């Protein structure tokens, strides 16, 4: 809460400067410049074996069709198979869970029951009801937390094959990802916090470091000295 932050930060700075002490304060960088949120790309999955790619594309194509039937946009892209050429690098997006999406578990189950049978279709519906492929588009960019790297491509305990590969056929959980809407909310809060920090730096005559601008420059080309 920006108001709580303003109250706590103001109290802290007032206490630290009560005896006439001077110092330096820095603001807070945007998460879009912090390596913890940017080091893992949205498409770290290499080209898949042809059979796996075909199987998943059929499944995700069926779900996209169910989405279209519900007048909802598609959530899955066509996955790329490994072409066997070591000179080329294929990349596929992560499969993630987005809790902001309408849950279409029931629609998926109904659409796939004639093909997969009730139990399997029910399971598929339960794990893909709010699943989608991660986006790298500017307007809808997802950010994958660095801690997620350790689980990408591993097997989800208790999930049956072939629906158990995390980030490929089993969705990364919501707490491993910042969606575009969540990133926008964090930016709004960061702007409010930084306004408080700058105002207090000015009122208390403290030196101010714009860490947000500096890290943004590092993230977008780097800092250049003497050249």
Predicted regions and their residues:
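Acidic, Ser/Thr/Gly/Pro-rich low-complexity segments that form flexible
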Residues: 31-203, 211-227
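Mobile, glycine-rich extracellular loop/lid and propeptide segments
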Residues: 1-12, 21-30, 208, 216, ...
